[in-house]
Regions:
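N-terminal nucleotide-binding beta1-loop-alpha1 segment
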Residues: 1-26
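Short, glycine-/small-residue-rich phosphate/pyrophosphate-handling segment
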Residues: 122, 139-165
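Conserved donor-nucleotide/metal-binding helix-loop-beta segment in metal-dependent transferases, i.e.
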Residues: 102-129
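Short, polar loop motifs at secondary-structure junctions
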Residues: 51-57
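Short phosphate-binding loop-to-helix
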Residues: 60-93, 153-154
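A short, N-terminal amphipathic alpha-helix
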Residues: 29-47
Length: 188
């Protein structure tokens, strides 16, 4: 099957794809998911993708493509999703966690513009749980994400990823730190 993309030239259209990465089998806060999907939907991008742990009869919001996750560990699944998205559309990518509270279209646009303009090679948004809520790349690079632990696996996956980006010589655009639904900052 061939994907055909028609892109109208518009000043306010961002030639980037946004991937919403849903971590299975973790329970997901419905309000955070709706907020994240709403922010992605309101951002003028070329492609919106929902990356799920298993592909079946999931509810798929209008305007989103569906990509299944493959691979075992968290970092392997991220690498595979980025590669699969890039294989069908060679556009820069923003991968987001939908459990981050406060994602806005402006945040996504800022990250996308930094990649498109060449100001940055990567975009990174730190998360309150020590992970990250945003990873933006101009092209996939397995070495950056394979071995990164999941947010529920302990350690400091955000710091590890940021260190890898720096070691690779990437210029990194930093997004604001966001709280993660279910962490103490949002519980109470």
């Amino acid at each position: 099957m061939t994907n055909v993309f028609f892109m109208e030239t518009q000043f306010d259209f961002l030639a980037v794809q946004v991937i919403v990465f849903v971590q299975p089998p973790a329970p997901l806060d419905g309000a955070a998911l709706r907020e994240a999907l709403g922010a992605v939907h309101a951002t003028p991008v070329a492609r919106r993708i929902l990356a799920l742990g298993r592909v079946g009869d999931e509810w798929l919001p209008n305007g989103f493509d569906l990509i299944g996750q493959r691979g075992g560990a968290y970092g392997e699944r991220i690498a595979a999703v980025l590669a699969d998205a890039h294989a069908t559309a060679t556009l820069p990518m923003l991968l987001i966690r939908p459990d981050a509270a406060g994602i806005t279209p402006d945040m996504l646009e800022d990250a996308a513009r930094s990649l498109i303009s060449g100001e940055a090679d990567a975009a990174f948004g730190p998360a309150s749980d020590g992970g990250f809520w945003l990873l933006g790349l101009r092209r996939p690079d397995r070495s950056l994400v394979v071995g990164i632990p999941g947010p529920d696996e302990g350690g400091a996956p955000g710091r590890l990823l940021l260190d890898r980006l720096a070691s690779a010589g990437f210029r990194v655009a930093l997004a604001p730190r966001l709280d993660i639904a279910g962490t103490p900052a949002l519980r109470g």
